[in-house]
Curated annotation (Swiss-Prot):
The gene is OPG023. It comes from Cowpox virus (strain Brighton Red) (CPV). SUPFAM superfamilies: Ankyrin repeat (SSF48403). InterPro entries: Ankyrin_rpt, Ankyrin_rpt-contain_sf, Multifunctional_ANK_Repeat, PRANC_domain. Residues 586-666 are annotated as: PRANC/F-box-like. ANK repeats lie at residues 31-64, 101-131, 135-166, 199-231, 235-266, 277-311, 334-368, 458-487, 491-521. Belongs to the orthopoxvirus OPG023 family. One of its GO terms (biological process) is symbiont-mediated suppression of host NF-kappaB cascade. Disulfide bonds: none annotated. Interacts (via N-terminus) with host RELA. Interacts (via PRANC/F-box-like domain) with the SKP1 component of the host SCF ubiquitin ligase complex. Transmembrane segments: none annotated. Substrate-specific adapter of SKP1-containing E3 ubiquitin-protein ligases which mediate the ubiquitination and subsequent proteasomal degradation of host target proteins. Prevents activation and subsequent nuclear localization of NF-kappa-B in infected cells, by targeting NF-kappa-B RELA subunit to the SCF E3 ligase complex. This is Ankyrin repeat domain-containing protein OPG023.
Amino acid sequence: MFDYLENEEVALDELKQMLRDRDPNDTRNQFKNNALHAYLFNEHCNNVEVVKLLLDSGTNPLHKNWRQLTPLGEYTNSRHGKVNKDIAMVLLEATGYSNINDFNIFTYMKSKNVDIDLIKVLVEHGFDFSVKCEKHHSVIENYVMTDDPVPEIIDLFIENGCSVIYEDEDDEYGYAYEEYHSQNDDYQPRNCGTVLHLYIISHLYSESDSRSCVNPEVVKCLINHGINPSSIDKNYCTALQYYIKSSHIDIDIVKLLMKGIDNTAYSYIDDLTCCTRGIMADYLNSDYRYNKDVDLDLVKLFLENGKPHGIMCSIVPLWRNDKETISLILKTMNSDVLQHILIEYITFSDIDISLVEYMLEYGAVVNKEAIHGYFKNINIDSYTMKYLLKKEGGDAVNHLDDGEIPIGHLCKSNYGRYNFYTDTYRQGFRDMSYACPILSTINICLPYLKDINMIDKRGETLLHKAVRYNKQSLVSLLLESGSDVNIRSNNGYTCIAIAINESRNIELLNMLLCHKPTLDCVIDSLREISNIVDNAYAIKQCIRYAMIIDDCISSKIPESISKHYNDYIDICNQELNEMKKIIVGGNTMFSLIFTDHGAKIIHRYANNPELRAYYESKQNKIYVEVYDIISNAIVKHNKIHKNIESVDDNTYISNLPYTIKYKIFEQQ
C-alpha cells in the first residue's frame, strides 16, 4: 500500500480496499512514514479526497518521520511545483491547526500558486513569521526573491511579524549587525543590504516568461514600509546602483529609488577593481551596464541630482574609452554645471587637455577659479599649466585664493614626492634645469607674476613658503627672480627665522644670507630663534654675517644670545679688525673681500706682498672663506697674465701698455 500511495495515481476505491487489511499508521518502513507521508510525497498527489480518506481511516496527522516532518511538513517540503490549498487546509484542520508551524513557508513561496487566502489562514492561526531559512533569510526576504511577489502578500507578511527594518537601520548600512555574530561558526555574514536590495538584485533580468522584471508597485510597497532607498550594502551600493544594471530600466522606478539620495553622482573607488564606482559611474561604464546604449534622459536625471565633483569622477575615467558618450553628455549640460565640473576636473584629476577642450567648446571657460584650482592639483605638470595660463591670460596668479598666494600651494608638503633638492645643488651649483615638474611649473608662472613679493593673509611671501617647506631649488629660483629676503610676516617672522626654527636647514640659511639681508632683518631673526642651544651653528652664521655689516652689533644682538656666544663674537671682531688694518693697494683687505667693488678688483692685487702674506698665514678660524676668495683671485690673475703673454706680437694689442691689456683680458 505504501508503495502504491507513494508512486501511483491513487484511486479512491482501490485505496479503500487496501485500507481494510492494512494499518495506515504502520511506520516500520525505513523512512518511518505513515500513509499520509507516503501519499503526500507522491508527485501526483492532488486529490484532497485521498487525504480525507486517509485521515478518516485514522492516519495520524501529527506523526513525524525520519526527517522529523509531519505529513504537512513533508507535503510543503517536497518536490511539488504547486501546493494544493485544499490539501493544506484539510491537514491543518485535522489537528486544530496545532501543526501550523510545520508548514514550510519557504518552499511554498517558490511554488507557482501562492494563495493569499492560505497566507491569511496562516496569519489568523498564529504562524511564526519570524522563522528563517537555512541561508538565514527571513520570510519576507525569501518572498521578494520569488518570481513575481505580490504587494498585498508583502503587506500581510510585514504586518504580521516580518520586519523589513533591521535593528541597525539608522547606521549607514542596511543589513543586520546581530546576524554577523551567530554562534554558528559556519555562518557567513550576508552581503545583501536591505529587502529592497534583495528584490532589485533578484529581478534585474527576466530569465523566463514566469519571472517578472522589477515591479514599481513592489518597490513602492517596500518603501512605504519604511525601507530607506539610500541604504547601502557591504559593497557600498544602493538598490538604485544595482537597478541601473537591469535589462529593462523604468525611469519612474529610478525616481522611486532616488528618494533620500542627495547626490546620484556620488562616487568611490572599488577596493577590488580600483575602478570608480557609483550610480552614475556604473551606468556610464559599459562593463556594468546591461544595455549597449546610454539613455540620455536617465543621464539628465542623474545630472540634475548629482554634485559636480561626483559627476566629474563619474565621467573622467571613461573618457579615453568612450569619448563619444562622454562628449554627448557634456553637450547636454548647461554652462553653469559644466563650469563647476571643469573646475572640479582641473582641481582634482590628472588632466587630459582634449577633455578640457571639449568642455570649453560646450561653454566652460578657464577662469581665475580654474587656475587657482589647478595650483591645488597634486598631479600638476608644466605643460598643462602653460596651456591653462595661455587660455586664462595669466592674471589669476596675481590674485589671492581665499587669502592664499595661488602659486604658494605648490610649495606645500603634498608635493613632496617631487625632488626639489637636486644633486646639482648639493654640489654647489644652482639647479636651473627645472627638471622637477613643480619647479618647472613655477618657472612658467613667474613671468605672469607682477609682484614676486606679493603677500598672503598672513603677510608671507612665496619665499617664506618655499623656505618653510625646505624647497631649496625653489628658494634659489625665487631669490634669482628678485624675492626680498627682508620681508616680515604679520607675526614678525622672517625667512631666516623660518629656516632656523622650522626648516632647520643650514644650506637654506646660507642661501638667504648670500642675498644680503639687512642688519635689522638678521637681528629680528635672532630675536625669533626659539632654541639658542640646539641652533648654535645657525646662530653663529647669522652673527658672523651681521658683524660684517656692523662690527658694533654686539649691543643690538639679543642679550640671551650675546651672553651665550660672547667668545665667538670676540673672535669675529678680532678677525674683521685684522682685515681692516691690512692695506692692499689703497684698499683694506676687508673691502676687497666683503664689498661688491672689492670682488671686482681683488685679482689685480694677487701679487701684492701684504695680500700674499695674509693668504699664506691662514690665521682665520671663522672667516675662512676669505682664503678661497683670495685663491680664486690668484687663479684669475694668473690666467689673465697667461693670456696677455700669448698675444701675437703682430697684433695691435701687443703694442698696448700692460695695464690696458690687463683690463681687456679681465673682462673675458
